[in-house]
Amino acid sequence: MKNERGLLIVMSGPSGVGKGTVRKALFSQPDINLHYSVSVTTRKPREGEVEGVDYFFRTREQFEQMIRENKLLEWAEYVGNYYGTPIDYVEKTLAEGKDVFLEIEVQGAMKVRRAFPEALFIFLAPPSLTELEKRIMGRGTESKELIENRLRAAKEELEMMDEYDYVVENDEVELACERIKAIVIAEHCRRERVAERYKRMLGVE
C-alpha cells in the first residue's frame, strides 16, 4: 500500500563507483516502477551519453542562470563542473504519487537531505579502493590531473557514508540492482509511511 505522495529515492556515491551503469541497468528491467529525474551538468558528454537521457548538457552561463532563477532542487560544483537537479519535474512527479529516482553527487545529496528529510538515501560503494581506482583510471577519457582529483574526492566521499540510510556495494551490477529494488520495496512497507495513509482513512490526526 503506497502513500499518496511518491517516494524520493536518492542514489549517490564516489566518482567511478558505477552510478550511471547501475542506474541504466536498474531502469532497463521490466518490473521497475521508478521515474528518473535527469540531472543538468556543465561537463562534456562522455562517449555514448545522450542529451536528455543521461544528462542535460549546458554551459556554465546557462547553469548559473538556472541557479539565479531557483530552478534547481540542488546543485554542486564537483571537480570543476556543475551538477544539479531540476526542481519542477521532481515536485510534479512526487505530487502525482510516483516514485522519483535521483542519481546525483554526494554534495548534492546532502542538500536534498535538508530539503527532503523523508527521502530514501542510498550510498553506492565500491568493493575496494583498489577497484575504485581501476574504474576511474579505466575510463581513458580524462587527464592525469583530473584522475588524481577524482580519486582524492572519491576517498573524501566514502567518509560521508554515515549520512545515508542504506549502503549498496557495487561488486556486480545485477546484484546491486536487486539490492536497490529490495530496499525500495521495504521502504514502502515502513510503518511511518503506511501509518500516515491509514490515519487519513480513519480521520485521525
Curated annotation (Swiss-Prot):
It catalyses: GMP + ATP = GDP + ADP. PROSITE patterns: GUANYLATE_KINASE_1 (PS00856), GUANYLATE_KINASE_2 (PS50052). GO terms for molecular function: ATP binding; guanylate kinase activity. SMART domains: GuKc. Its EC number is 2.7.4.8. Keywords: ATP-binding, Cytoplasm, Kinase, Nucleotide-binding, Transferase. It comes from the Bacteria. It is found in: Cytoplasm. Pfam families: Guanylate_kin. One of its GO terms (cellular component) is cytosol. ATP binds at G13, P14, S15, G16, V17, G18, K19, G20. Residues 6-185 form the Guanylate kinase-like domain. Belongs to the guanylate kinase family. HAMAP family: Guanylate_kinase. PANTHER family: GUANYLATE KINASE, GUANYLATE KINASE-RELATED. Essential for recycling GMP and indirectly, cGMP. This is Guanylate kinase.
